[in-house]
């Protein structure tokens, strides 16, 4: 076996399959692009679903990749097992209807055992096969030459995730030797494929032969596929003779960096601290890559996953004695390890560090909140003479605050309490079940369709230079079938050439007409999409007979196209302006280019200020008024990148690409349609800016006529305001409004002073009405004040004058009730709490509340219940 680094293994794999005619597909973003079914890219095949389900036909049916992936099921096992990770790399080779079992098996064996490649000892390799897959077994035995005792039948060797491609698979295992056997020799699991550490699975070859239909039947696929996956971390652990994946060069530099933080704890000192080192190393890899790909910590979706990973890593840092923000210091270490194939982490190092550090510092504040909650719960348990912390509370601390169960156990043990492990496990299992349900929905692929996939005719787009074009009608599809003619209803058409732009890249499809040679409109074009083999598929409403093989005139709606051109070029200017104002991290996360408006989604950590929006808008308009020529060129992808063209991360580009140059200001890869000069846009106006998800914000804007109409509407509204504030000239509106605001403030201040005097008068009356129950002096009264703030002011007066032991006040405004309860420290010392009192009386007014032992408040919706609430005070005190 050769001595290789992880970088060498990755590159060797890609080089091997490139030599077998495969195209190397770059690793896609961890954040799925145009796939709402996935939370994360979780396998090498996840980015290729469109090829496997037949919705798109690849340029080369042979594909290989090294794909970064994230799986977050069983996060709590990370660090405790030898090979469980949140982020990992999957090496894969794929065939879309090209080669099948024979080549897949032979090439796998060649890569593993060939002297030019990994050079594994063949005697250490075992394979498992599906019992009914006699062909795979025959190839392994008769062609590869494996002995029968190295081929094991396993019933589970059938890959099936619901509707979509499915089929048998064969798995390859490496025998690490008897020293790795972690179960008794006679254990039934002691075999390749069993639950043991001796036989390590390194490669899974899936033979997709069937469509698993929604009706739960299995039908032969029109095109059989190969989908393989080899875990890089596992293979490297074998090559580098590492006991677990964590002792490889993918993780050890991170672990050493944690050791260097000066806590005097070293990796290998103890199993417990080793777990913490592993968790930190694993989680910072996932965080660095995910944030670099545009995901940001939040309380929902993938942002919640990142927040949970970061908090778990911070808590394990505390176990190593690290009590300050430290994870951000590890980001450059991750970047250096992966830079040979994933330069993006180092390229975005500053931004990733900023996000991680900010989140760490916030969590240190949250930890204190969690400890406060835990201490409160412990006190309640002790007050109730209990001895066990409820499992739901433990889970809430774990899930919300990132508290490891062990930490809760330690605190509870110090307080002489036990923990409800069974209750905690019940909550954990419920969460796992929710995750499993989500994954079962996420991972299924569409059922493969043969109709469009088998249409091979070429269809050329001529719409960059023409809006009207005569072309032969090649294909008519109606009712999911190929037909020779159509005379009514809806149909899908493919022409030899077309000026109609198909919906893609955020730009909506053109609309227009199909005319016959007599100039009569025979169909309205209502939508255009790309077919699997790249043809332009026109969805039409048929008005008169259409026949295959005839020549028709295709006419794009010129007015609509012109409006789209302006908005598309404006999005390019806006994209560059965003980066100029907010920073290079502000990447496009989605867009819509329609005739009436444009929408641009972008990644950004934090709010966008009104000043920043104004600067962006000004920059775009300046570029419009500079009358910059917009030049498009067609070139190869490498040349385009060398030109500095901005590629949208996660998008797939072919060998030939279009580069849109707006002078030297903006250079982007784009297949859309654009104006010839920025001055054609006219004017640009931002309509709104908002957050739409974790770390993703949206700008909506208009150009040209729509921008002018918006400005007209804003001017009309301004004139209305001028009339309302009695300002004869628009330029005086601001001054007049400021004067009115000052008058309003003066009146509010005067009103508050009057209200205060009235409250003082009421206080004089109510403070005289002191009642007594069982030696407790109390005041309970309804007062006429406007809000809770004035109730608190009355309570402050009561406290200063020490007029009674207990005070309860109520007020009602606009059908809303406010209640306040206050108690002296003497009452608190006797076990009475204002919070308990308020909880007892609040239901009478249809509400609830709480607070401190000395003061509490509540709200309600039933003013009619105030009298009952105040009467309940005496009952509560009598029984307290």
UniProtKB/Swiss-Prot annotation:
The keyword Protein biosynthesis applies. Pfam families: DHHA1, tRNA-synt_2c, tRNA_SAD. One of its GO terms (biological process) is alanyl-tRNA aminoacylation. InterPro entries: aa-tRNA-synth_II/BPL/LPL, Ala-tRNA-lgiase_IIc, Ala-tRNA-ligase_IIc_anticod-bd, Ala-tRNA-synth_IIc_core, Ala-tRNA-synth_IIc_N, Ala-tRNA_ligase, Ala_tRNA_ligase_euk/bac, DHHA1_dom. The keyword Transferase does not apply. PROSITE patterns: AA_TRNA_LIGASE_II_ALA. Binds 1 zinc ion per subunit. Its main location: cytoplasm. GO terms for cellular component: cytosol. It is found in: Cytoplasm. Its cofactor is Zn(2+). Zn(2+) binds at residues 568, 572, 670, 674. Its EC number is 6.1.1.7. One of its GO terms (molecular function) is zinc ion binding. Keywords: Aminoacyl-tRNA synthetase, ATP-binding, Cytoplasm, Ligase, Metal-binding, Nucleotide-binding, Protein biosynthesis, RNA-binding, tRNA-binding, Zinc. It catalyses: tRNA(Ala) + L-alanine + ATP = L-alanyl-tRNA(Ala) + AMP + diphosphate. Belongs to the class-II aminoacyl-tRNA synthetase family. PANTHER family: ALANINE--TRNA LIGASE, CYTOPLASMIC, ALANYL-TRNA SYNTHETASE. Consists of three domains; the N-terminal catalytic domain, the editing domain and the C-terminal C-Ala domain. The editing domain removes incorrectly charged amino acids, while the C-Ala domain, along with tRNA(Ala), serves as a bridge to cooperatively bring together the editing and aminoacylation centers thus stimulating deacylation of misacylated tRNAs. Catalyzes the attachment of alanine to tRNA(Ala) in a two-step reaction: alanine is first activated by ATP to form Ala-AMP and then transferred to the acceptor end of tRNA(Ala). Also edits incorrectly charged Ser-tRNA(Ala) and Gly-tRNA(Ala) via its editing domain. This is Alanine--tRNA ligase. It comes from Enterococcus faecalis (strain ATCC 700802 / V583). The lineage of its organism: Bacteria, Bacillati, Bacillota, Bacilli, Lactobacillales. The gene is alaS.
């Amino acid at each position: 076996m050769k001595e290789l680094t992880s970088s060498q293994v990755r590159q060797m794999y890609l080089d091997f399959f490139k030599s077998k005619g495969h195209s190397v597909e770059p690793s896609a973003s961890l954040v799925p692009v145009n796939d709402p079914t996935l939370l994360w890219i979780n396998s090498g095949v996840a980015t290729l679903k469109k090829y496997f389900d037949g919705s798109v036909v690849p340029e080369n049916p042979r594909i290989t990749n090294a794909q970064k992936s994230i799986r977050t099921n069983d996060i709590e096992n990370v660090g405790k097992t030898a090979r469980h990770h949140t982020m990992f790399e999957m090496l894969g080779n794929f065939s879309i209807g090209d080669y099948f079992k024979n080549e897949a098996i032979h090439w796998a064996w060649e890569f593993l055992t060939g002297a030019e490649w990994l050079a594994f000892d063949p005697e250490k390799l075992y394979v498992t096969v599906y019992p009914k897959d006699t062909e795979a077994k025959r190839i392994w035995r008769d062609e590869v030459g494996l002995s029968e005792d190295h081929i094991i039948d396993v019933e589970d060797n059938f890959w099936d995730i619901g509707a979509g491609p499915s089929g048998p698979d064969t798995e390859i295992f490496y025998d690490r030797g008897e020293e790795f056997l972690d179960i008794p020799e006679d254990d039934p699991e002691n075999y390749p494929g069993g639950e043991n550490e001796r036989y390590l699975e390194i490669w899974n070859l899936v033979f997709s032969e069937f469509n698993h239909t929604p009706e739960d039947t299995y039908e032969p696929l029109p095109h059989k596929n190969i989908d393989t996956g080899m875990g890089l971390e596992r293979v490297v652990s074998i090559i580098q003779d590492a006991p677990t994946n964590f002792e490889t060069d993918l993780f050890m530099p991170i672990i050493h960096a944690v050791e260097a933080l000066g806590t005097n704890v070293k990796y290998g000192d103890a199993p417990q601290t080793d777990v913490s080192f592993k968790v930190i190393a694993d989680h910072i890899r996932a965080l660095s890559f995910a944030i670099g790909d545009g995901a940001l910590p939040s309380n929902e979706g993938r942002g919640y996953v990142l927040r949970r990973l970061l908090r778990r890593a911070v808590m394990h840092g505390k176990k190593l004695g690290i009590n300050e923000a430290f994870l951000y210091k590890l980001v450059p270490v991750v970047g250096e390890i992966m830079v040979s194939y994933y330069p993006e982490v180092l390229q975005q190092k500053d931004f990733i560090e900023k996000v991680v550090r900010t989140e760490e510092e916030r969590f240190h504040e949250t930890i204190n909140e969690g400890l406060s909650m835990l201490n409160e719960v412990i006190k309640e348990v002790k007050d109730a003479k209990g001895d066990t912390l409820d499992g739901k509370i433990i889970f809430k601390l774990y899930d919300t605050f990132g508290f490891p169960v062990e930490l809760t156990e330690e605190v509870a043990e110090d307080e002489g309490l036990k923990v409800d492990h069974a209750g905690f496990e019940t909550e954990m299992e419920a969460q796992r079940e929710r995750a499993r349900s989500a994954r079962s929905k996420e991972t299924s692929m569409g059922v493969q369709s043969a109709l469009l996939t088998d249409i091979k005719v070429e269809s050329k787009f001529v719409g960059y230079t023409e809006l009207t074009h005569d072309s032969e009608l090649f294909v008519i599809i109606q009712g999911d079938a190929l037909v020779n003619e159509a005379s009514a209803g809806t149909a899908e058409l493919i022409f030899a050439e077309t000026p109609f732009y198909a919906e893609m890249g955020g730009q909506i499809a053109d609309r227009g007409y199909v005319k016959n040679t007599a100039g009569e409109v025979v169909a309205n074009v209502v939508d255009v999409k790309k077919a699997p083999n790249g043809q332009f598929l026109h969805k039409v409403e048929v008005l008169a007979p259409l026949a295959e093989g005839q020549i028709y005139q295709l006419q794009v709606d010129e007015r609509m196209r012109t409006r789209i051109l302006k908005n598309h070029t404006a999005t390019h200017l806006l994209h560059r302006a965003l980066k100029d104002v907010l920073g290079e991290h502000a990447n496009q996360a989605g867009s819509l280019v329609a005739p009436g408006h444009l929408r641009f989604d972008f990644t950004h950590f934090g709010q966008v200020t009104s000043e920043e929006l104004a600067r962006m808008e000004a920059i775009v308009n300046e570029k419009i008024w500079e009358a910059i020529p917009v030049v498009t060129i067609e070139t190869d992808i490498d040349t385009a990148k060398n030109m500095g063209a901005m590629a949208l991360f996660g998008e797939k580009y072919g060998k030939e690409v279009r580069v849109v140059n707006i002078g030297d200001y903006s250079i982007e890869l784009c297949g859309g349609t654009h104006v010839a000069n920025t001055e054609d846009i006219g004017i640009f106006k931002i309509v709104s800016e908002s957050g739409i998800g974790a770390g993703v914000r949206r700008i909506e804007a208009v150009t040209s006529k729509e921008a002018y109409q918006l400005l007209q509407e804003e001017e009309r509204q301004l004139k209305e305001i001028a009339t309302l504030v009695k300002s004869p000239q628009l330029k005086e509106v601001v001054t007049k409004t400021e004067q009115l605001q000052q008058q309003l403030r003066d009146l509010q201040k005067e009103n508050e002073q009057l209200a205060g005097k009235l409250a003082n008068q009421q206080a004089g009356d109510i403070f005289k009405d002191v009642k007594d129950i069982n030696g407790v002096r109390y005041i309970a009264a309804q007062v006429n004040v406007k809000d809770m703030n004035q109730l608190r002011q009355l309570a402050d007066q009561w406290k200063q004058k020490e007029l009674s032991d207990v005070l309860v006040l109520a007020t009602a405004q606009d059908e809303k009730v406010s209640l306040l309860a206050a108690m002296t420290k003497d009452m608190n010392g006797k076990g009475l709490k204002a919070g308990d009192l308020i909880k007892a009386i609040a239901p009478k007014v249809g509400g609830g509340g709480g607070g401190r032992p000395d003061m509490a408040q509540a709200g309600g919706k039933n003013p009619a219940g105030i009298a009952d609430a105040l009467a309940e005070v005496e009952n509560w005190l009598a029984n307290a």
